[in-house]
Amino acid sequence: MVLFTDQNRKELKRRFRKDLKKEILFSLFTTNSSLLTIPGRECPDCPQAQELLEEICALSPKIDLKIYNYFDALESRRQYDIDKIPAIVTESEGANRLVFYGVPQGYQFPVFLEGMERMSRDVSSLANTTRKGFSKVDRLVTLRIFVSSNSITAASVAKLAQAAALESRLISAEIIDVNGFPELRRAYNVS
């Protein structure tokens, strides 16, 4: 399945050539695709997440992808603190990591790309007073943002959470697509 049109690819290639300075690594936690599904190990969004990242990686030599089988990569799961799939960890040298649970699509896709680009450029989108405020954080904080692909408000909040995480190593941002995790939607009463 092709996710991007030729025009989309052309625009993204241009954008990545211009905006990516440092290399980006995506670590995808997924399951092995198989015709046999083991109960409790289903992940209907995993193939789409992998396909999306593979298409993005094909657009720039500065973007790489490492794929982990969630059920086999216990040490890596602990290292990245991953507890559900699909999980996309975005990293770049010298920057804090960003985590997206699910498939970044709809309004979340541009936020996903902007986070990656800001990370690669070491550029903050925050005002200096806000940056100073985040520099005063003195303990670990996890910002868990629940989003859906059709919510522009959630996209704005996710963008701010990513900016905060890129500002301080003590702040981590987890963006969670509630459409892919209905049990979390119910548990946290997300509408």
PLM feature spans:
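Catalytic cores of large soluble enzymes that bind and process phosphate-bearing ligands
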Residues: 4, 41, 45, 104
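Thioredoxin-like thiol-disulfide oxidoreductase module
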Residues: 61-94, 170-191
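N-terminal leader/targeting and pre-domain segments
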Residues: 1-25, 29, 108-138
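N-terminal, well-ordered alpha-helical segments
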Residues: 47-54, 75, 86, 110, ...
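Short, surface-exposed acidic/glycine-rich loop or hinge patches that mediate macromolecular interfaces
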Residues: 71, 103, 148-151, 178-179
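Local sequence-structure signature of Cys/Sec-based thiol-disulfide redox active-site neighborhoods
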Residues: 14-59, 134-169, 173
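Non-catalytic, surface beta->alpha helical segment in thiol-disulfide oxidoreductase systems
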Residues: 87-123
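Generic structural signal for well-ordered secondary structure
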Residues: 46-49, 70, 81-82, 105
